[in-house]
From Swiss-Prot:
Gene Ontology BP annotations: cell wall organization; peptidoglycan biosynthetic process; regulation of cell shape; response to antibiotic
TM ranges: 1-21, 48-68, 101-121, 125-145, 161-181, 202-222, 231-251, 266-286
Classification of source organism: Bacteria, Bacillati, Bacillota, Bacilli, Bacillales
The name this protein goes by in its record: Undecaprenyl-diphosphatase
EC number, UniProt record: 3.6.1.27
Record's subcellular location: Cell membrane
Family statement: Belongs to the UppP family.
UniProt catalytic activity: di-trans,octa-cis-undecaprenyl diphosphate + H2O = di-trans,octa-cis-undecaprenyl phosphate + phosphate + H(+)
Further information: Bacitracin is thought to be involved in the inhibition of peptidoglycan synthesis by sequestering undecaprenyl diphosphate, thereby reducing the pool of lipid carrier available.
HAMAP family for the chain: Undec_diphosphatase
Function: Catalyzes the dephosphorylation of undecaprenyl diphosphate (UPP). Confers resistance to bacitracin.
InterPro entries reported for this sequence: UppP (IPR003824)
Pfam families named among the record's database cross-references: BacA
UniProt organism field: Staphylococcus epidermidis (strain ATCC 35984 / DSM 28319 / BCRC 17069 / CCUG 31568 / BM 3577 / RP62A)
Amino acid sequence: MFLLELIKGIILGIVEGLTEFAPVSSTGHMILVDDMWLKSTNFLGSQSAFTFKVVIQLGSVFAAAWVFRERFLEILHIGQHKPEPSTSGDRRSKPRRLNLIHVLVGMVPAGILGFLFDDLIEKYLFSVPTVLIGLFIGAIYMIIADKYSKTVQHPQTVDQINYFQAFVIGISQAIAMWPGFSRSGSTISTGVLMKLNHKAASDFTFIMSVPIMLAASGLSLLKHYEYIHLAHIPFYILGFLAAFIVGLIAIKTFLHLINKVKLVPFAIYRIVLVIFIAILYFGFGIGKGI
């Protein structure tokens, strides 16, 4: 039984690492896994399972922090980083550089919304039906953004983002607190609609997400610290490591491919997932009444 629980923990860490920064909604996937699998197997008990999911999310966050470590050091004026060259062809303009203010401006909307409504969001939106709605609406938004990207040029790199763009992208991050909508799907789509290329929008999304996710995860652990048990430490360690290692691979692969594959393939996956889960949930009652 102990070995089986460890395997479940590793699987959850892999799912978290694969989905946290892909535009498919890791929270949505974890809720689906929770409602349609974990609750039926009573993995660690409901409250301890929640803290486990927070811990493995930290694994993915630390993976993103590692991938962008040079950027964070430069933003904090600890390291040196040359801004990406402009592709606009204007050599007279002095290149901008992404700085701490951009990150803070992008964090403000989600920070305020999370502080005010975190408990309500967790109470009313963390269910299979609401996740399916978020997955579907988010997929449509991503398709619209990709269609728009084919009709305009996207010359801006991440170092050319201005404060207004950072704030608007931050608003879309706040909207993505609806489980299933997807933080990266929402913010990358908004960045593309604001004339960033897909890679630049992805870079800013990941950089902006790390501090706010660290804060949110830390707050969740403080609120539920009584459910952290020494007996569960092996699960936390293995789940964290699985999420961290898989997250590193997933993030690097995603950033390498995003300008080529765009967002539509992820949107199609989301729509197919919605149909599949809806059939299981509404047609066969799997995940209901657990």
